[in-house]
Amino acid sequence: MSKNNGKGAKGEFEFPQPAKKQTFSEMIYNPQEGTFFGRTGKSWSQLLLFYTIFYIVLAALFTICMQGLLSTISDTEPKWKLQDSLIGTNPGLGFRPLSEQTERGSVIAFDGKKPAESDYWIELIDDFLRDYNHTEGRDMKHCGFGQVLEPTDVCVVNTDLFGGCSKANNYGYKTNQPCIFLKLNKIFGWIPEVYDKEEKDMPDDLKKVINETKTEERQQVWVSCNGHLGKDKENFQNIRYFPSQGFPSYYYPFLNQPGYLSPLVAVQFNSPPKGQMLDVECRAWAKNIQYSGSVRDRKGSVTFQILLD
């Protein structure tokens, strides 16, 4: 086969020779070309130098960025607080015991005459109160109303004042007088604006408690428990609160103090009906705690059910 180059000259066209197949050992090291895995020693050195410099620069940039980020973060307090944070300024109200078995929901069902059933709830409360009962080695103070405290002071939650809701009384579960422990969720820097006098929306029993409490001791986030949606009011005439019907204001604000424990209110139901579901709603009362009883958007309150078999 020939072709004309445009000037009358003739030449032969040659097909390219197929590449010589390399053996596996030649792919690793080719002595003729002096290559190792297809690269010469110089080429490998240049490649290694490039990636070494590349990753050193990358690590340096990452370190600079992390240092810049960490310089804006405190080990002791969040950067965004209260209304600037996702948590906001409205603490939620929680309760214990709460079963780890999700199918139980918020129902506390038991028969005090059946040890296995009552012991289940007693053990849950024991676990919850473990930190409250073992405060050895912590820098804590026994606080009181009117006492001058430093912002970093941590006040003791005295479980000896829980009365009928004490460990010695099995939290009332052996005598069908169960106790529920209420606590406010911690919000950094939140300070309660308390009601030092009764409000028209408060239940009558809470109004009575406030009026009978000394003025200096009214600095509390009050709590009340009644029938959810106004039900079963007749079954809420015989309940007690320990050590008082509120969370004392001297426990606040929470500033991430070492050893801090949220205050508790123990609520004992002395005569719950047997064989009937008691639907309970407990509410926290403070000027800066919003309340909503909505199922989808509950605020400042919590609901649970008690069922004595």
From Swiss-Prot:
The sodium/potassium-transporting ATPase is composed of a catalytic alpha subunit, an auxiliary non-catalytic beta subunit and an additional regulatory subunit. Interacts with nkain. It is a single-pass type II membrane protein. It is found in: Cell membrane. Keywords: Cell membrane, Disulfide bond, Glycoprotein, Ion transport, Membrane, Potassium, Potassium transport, Signal-anchor, Sodium, Sodium transport, Sodium/potassium transport, Transmembrane, Transmembrane helix, Transport. This is Sodium/potassium-transporting ATPase subunit beta-1. The chain crosses the membrane at residues 46-66. GO terms for molecular function: ATPase activator activity. It comes from Drosophila melanogaster (Fruit fly). Disulfide bonds join C143-C155, C165-C179, C225-C282. One of its GO terms (cellular component) is plasma membrane. GO terms for biological process: intracellular potassium ion homeostasis; intracellular sodium ion homeostasis; monoatomic cation transport; potassium ion import across plasma membrane; sodium ion export across plasma membrane. PANTHER family: AT04468P-RELATED, SODIUM/POTASSIUM-DEPENDENT ATPASE BETA SUBUNIT. Its main location: membrane. The keyword Ion transport applies. Glycans are attached at N133, N211. PROSITE patterns: ATPASE_NA_K_BETA_1. In embryos, it is expressed in the neurons of the CNS and PNS, in Garland cells and posterior spiracles. In adults, it is concentrated in the thorax and abdomen (muscle tissue, digestive system and Malpighian tubules) and weakly expressed in the head. Expression is diffuse in the nervous system. Residues 67-309 are extracellular. Residues 1-45 are cytoplasmic. InterPro entries: Na/K_ATPase_sub_beta, Na/K_ATPase_sub_beta_sf. This is the non-catalytic component of the active enzyme, which catalyzes the hydrolysis of ATP coupled with the exchange of Na(+) and K(+) ions across the plasma membrane. The beta subunit regulates, through assembly of alpha/beta heterodimers, the number of sodium pumps transported to the plasma membrane. Belongs to the X(+)/potassium ATPases subunit beta family.
